[in-house]
Amino acid sequence: MDYLWWIVLLIWTLIAPERGTVAQRSKSNVPRLKPSYKEMLESNNLLTFNGLANSSAYHTFLLDEERGRLFVGAKDHVLSFNLVDINMDQQLISWPSSPSRRDECKWAGKDVQKECANFIKVLQPFNQTHLYACGTGAFHPVCAHVEVGKRSEDNTFRLGSSFENGRGKSPYDPKLQTASMLIDGELYAGTSADFMGRDFAIFRTLGKHHPIRTEQHDSRWLNDPRFVSVHLIPESDNAEDDKIYLFFRENAIDGEQISKATHARIGQLCKNDFGGHRSLVNKWTTFLKARLVCSVPGLNGIDTHFDELQDVFLMSSKDPKNPIIYAVFTTSSNIFKGSAVCMYSMADIRRVFLGPYAHRDGPNYQWVPFLNRVPYPRPGTCPSKTFDGFESTKDFPDDVITFARSHPAMYNPVFPINNHPIIIKTDVDYQFTQIVVDRVEAEDGQYDVMFIGTDMGTVLKVVSIPRGTWHDLEEVLLEEMTVFREPTAITAMELSTKQQQLYLGSAIGVSQMPLHRCDVYGKACAECCLARDPYCAWDGSQCSRYFPTAKRRTRRQDIRNGDPLTQCSDLQHHDEADGEAGLLDKTVYGVENSSSFLECSPKSQRALIYWQFQRHGEDHKLEIKSDERVLGTEQGLLIRSLHQKDSGVYYCHAVEHGFIQTLLRLTLNVIPAEHLDDLLHRDPPDTNDPANGKMWYRDFLSLINPPSPNSVDQLCEQVWKRERKQRRQKANLLHASQSHTSQILHSSQSHAKWKLLQENKKGRNRRTHEMQRAPRSV
């Protein structure tokens, strides 16, 4: 068989699915749209800063809406970006470690490039004109003030001249996380406080008070924690009750788990805690912690836990005392890889902190609830001279301090709202790393739109929609967008409601993307409704940003059901007319008894594809059913063996939520097999010709990387034309070569005769003569 057709057969064998009926996989949990990095750039929906040549680790973000700037801490640098466009008006501060510090770090056995540098870990607003920044300082933490000016017009961005010791504010090791927040001139930070990375603590530094921290070397307080975030949440209208909440994960305390495990935690501190008088001096006296549970109940009573807390976002509500907490978790197991998002209410958290304390008791010294008398005031309560008469924690009785020291953990865990995650991902090749949430006003209510970063450089846009009640939520994955040029973990995310933009940080750079891309959903009312994006609605002419104003009553939107038949039924004929006008027409050719693949892929990954066939000269259309010869796939229609009766027009339709859209009209012409010899008539290929080997390789590459659906037809046509051209060129070259050789031979013979005649004339008296020989040209 001709080598080209062997290659065609090989390629179709590779791309064709297994024989038999292929069941449609569930599409409810896949993103409706999945644009690539290139598509995001080409659609002007992504701006990227690809990093500095001598820097990396763009992990620390500080969003300043008033100045319109995004401050980013990286390796040896602090950067300032314009919120409108991160590639416009960039500012840079270089803050490397001193050569002596780098040498000391190197002599300690640390990596010069990855560890012996100043990795910025803390960026907090200090006052109206300055930021407070801290870095690892090549394993010698250092802090300084950064002047940014009072207004953006000041165009000020410079590092202060005085530096402070960063111990208790920034970790020594750049691989360790730090959670920090600057409140009323005091810095609350969860970090490591020693060179070896073993002394983890929650610190309060700066301000007019003495620094304070958690108890040292006591695993009941902290057991090798990894801090995630710090938040101030008011407890009541009385400022004396304000509490600081810390989110972290740590190793389970002995006895909590049979094997070594990680638990997610929430910890609380009173803002007005100044330590004890005789015990716990300069140590927290109001520190309590509880386990955060995010699990899926099992049928056999064994729950599947997501214990690795990765990120936390607080969604503000009308009541500042009761924000909704969104938390991202991953699994600890190396076998089972998954991610989840759970929601928590402050009411449930406060109920746990008012519940029983964890206490070791019994013959096995296991953890049980403490049921004896609890000293007054209850440990964990903030001092208040208004209610309990204690002006400071230094006034607490000794039994309160002693109890607080030995009972920092609560017995009951905090369960998520509805006792179930709102999002679970276990069948994907990525894990969640970051989350931000935006509350969006839609036509039928408010929705929280989640933007979730992954460890593969993608962002998921997800909205939770109530099926019947708010206790039964449906996860709708709108988009999965690639926002970095290569797979890399997203380690920082900030959302600007003013600019309606999302900012993302990673080890290799910073990216910016809009919160909504309504124009990409399509040009029809039905496509806009099918998107179920709370940001978008059909305005009568296009899918555009939805604004909840009384003047725009013609907006069409259905987030809860996504039903285009109810929202756009009166526009169906208009959409169909537009669809017919913009329908893609293609013509392809196939050879009888060979294979052919008709490619058709819908924009929406949730759409189902079906095909119709119309013979030439007929009006009615027949639906194509998959069988042994014809196989429908998600990428198109594969006809294993073409017949003459397969010639005709093929229609590719996408069906989603009852809405049918025609994507492609394709005309297939089948060439009879008896014409094949005439079309492909040529000499057998010379396998010893190196040029022919190159043709084999080029033809093979063209087949395995087709530029278009009918690339095989185009390739065959190119090969036929090329071979005919080569035959003509070969014949012309042979004829020209023969003519040229005859001319040279004739000329050479004439020249030889003339030369011989001249030699005979000159050398008649010579005794010797040279041997006569033909010229080399002959």
Swiss-Prot record:
Start and end residues of each stretch annotated as Disordered: 727-778
Q: Which InterPro entries match?
A: Ig-like_dom (IPR007110), Ig-like_dom_sf (IPR036179), Ig-like_fold (IPR013783), Ig_sub (IPR003599), PSI (IPR016201), Semap_dom (IPR001627), Semap_dom_sf (IPR036352), Semaphorin (IPR027231)
**Where do Basic and acidic residues bias regions lie?**
756-778
Provide ranges: composition bias, Polar residues.
Answer: 735-751
- Record-annotated Sema domain positions: 32-515
Task: List the GO cellular component terms.
Answer: axon; extracellular space; glutamatergic synapse; plasma membrane
State the disulfide connectivity.
105-116, 134-143, 270-382, 294-342, 518-536, 652-716
Q: Enumerate the subcellular locations listed in this protein's record, separating them with semicolons.
A: Secreted
Specify the signal sequence span. Answer: 1-17
Instruction: Write down the glycosylated positions.
Output: 54, 127, 593
Q: Which PROSITE patterns match?
A: IG_LIKE (PS50835), SEMA (PS51004)
- Tissue expression per record: Expressed in rhombomeres three and five, and in the posterior half of newly formed somites which is avoided by ventrally extending motor axons.
Which keywords annotate this record?
A: Developmental protein, Differentiation, Disulfide bond, Glycoprotein, Immunoglobulin domain, Neurogenesis, Secreted, Signal
- By its UniProt entry, which SUPFAM superfamilies does this protein fall under? Immunoglobulin, Plexin repeat, Sema domain
Record-annotated Ig-like C2-type domain positions: 579-668
What processes does the entry annotate via GO biological process terms?
branching involved in blood vessel morphogenesis; branching morphogenesis of a nerve; morphogenesis of a branching structure; motor neuron axon guidance; negative chemotaxis; neural crest cell migration; positive regulation of cell migration; semaphorin-plexin signaling pathway
Q: Which family does the record claim for this protein?
A: Belongs to the semaphorin family.
General function of this protein: Might normally influence the midsegmental pathway choice of the ventrally extending motor axons by contributing to a repulsive domain in the posterior somite.
Official protein name in the record: Semaphorin-3ab
Q: Which gene encodes it?
A: sema3ab
